[in-house]
Amino acid sequence: MDTQRIKDDEDAIRSALTSLKTATGIPVTMFATVLQDNRLQITQWVGLRTPALQNLVIEPGVGVGGRVVATRRPVGVSDYTRANVISHEKDSAIQDEGLHSIVAVPVIVHREIRGVLYVGVHSAVRLGDTVIEEVTMTARTLEQNLAINSALRRNGVPDGRGSLKANRVMNGAEWEQVRSTHSKLRMLANRVTDEDLRRDLEELCDQMVTPVRIKQTTKLSARELDVLACVALGHTNVEAAEEMGIGAETVKSYLRSVMRKLGAHTRYEAVNAARRIGALP
């Protein structure tokens, strides 16, 4: 791994941790990197009171982080040392730091788990759905930033390219506004009869999607993207059909096609999969 890649990725991770702490008010944010032997190591942190967790190495399957890597899903516990969904080899380190509630989310780039994003508090309070959603949104944004770093390197973009990347990671609310705007633009393009204007609107939509999309082999049609954009807004099949001016059965057909292409089992898995490959923001 070259020095420039390490610096670029560390900057993106640091920005994510800072942004997450600001957005949630949670005192502790951490990132654990997946090592070559599938162990985790906490390599960056904000707000730790002691060195107990700093640079801590976590064996596969151990604790919250190990479970996240094993399941590839978010994990949250409100009382770490008593939680029955995780193993407890690292309880002493957690107790030394004084953490109680922890939420951890995987960071996945090109289907490979690159690390785990954590938040934690030093008191016995439950971290609610709003916090979990914010951590998840930040993880998704970090995934895209890491993917952009990788894409820029593959394309030989020279050093000193900071102007091409955001100086900070958007928080969940800001990112959701981008997604909502993208979906509404796609719906507007769908209703426009002027072909030139429609193409202009579709180009605007494309500009809101990360460069990862260019490298993907999975090809989604414009109509399939329209359906996904509706689903991303929370529309039912009937509402999507009304928005697009087509039948509900046609919407279902598009969704089945999308789910098959993306290997998704539900409509919301399809939306998340599309975001991972850069087909949706």
From Swiss-Prot:
InterPro entries named in the record: GAF, GAF-like_dom_sf, HTH-type_RamA-like, Sig_transdc_resp-reg_C-effctor, Tscrpt_reg_LuxR_C, WH-like_DNA-bd_sf
GO biological process: acetate metabolic process; regulation of DNA-templated transcription
A family per Pfam: GerE
CDD domains tied to this protein: LuxR_C_like
Domain HTH luxR-type intervals: 213-278
Record's note on what induces expression: RamA represses its own expression.
Gene Ontology molecular-function annotations: DNA binding
Phenotype when the gene is knocked out: Cells lacking this gene grow on acetate with the same aconitase activity as cells on glucose. This mutant is unable to grow on acetate as the sole carbon and energy source and, in comparison to the wild-type, shows very low specific activities of phosphotransacetylase, acetate kinase, isocitrate lyase, and malate synthase, irrespective of the presence of acetate in the medium. The transcription level of the rpf2 gene is reduced 2.5-fold in the ramA deletion mutant during growth on glucose as the sole carbon source.
Alphabetic keyword roster: Activator, DNA-binding, Transcription, Transcription regulation
KW DNA-binding (keyword) present: yes
NCBIfam families attached to this UniProt entry: transregRamA
Functional summary from the UniProt entry: RamA is a master regulator of acetate metabolism. It positively controls the expression of acnA, aceA, aceB, ack, pta and ramB genes in the presence of acetate. RamA is also a positive regulator of rpf2 gene expression during growth on glucose as the sole carbon source.
Protein name listed in UniProt: HTH-type transcriptional activator RamA
Organism encoding this protein: Corynebacterium glutamicum (strain ATCC 13032 / DSM 20300 / JCM 1318 / BCRC 11384 / CCUG 27702 / LMG 3730 / NBRC 12168 / NCIMB 10025 / NRRL B-2784 / 534)
Taxonomic path: Bacteria, Bacillati, Actinomycetota, Actinomycetes, Mycobacteriales
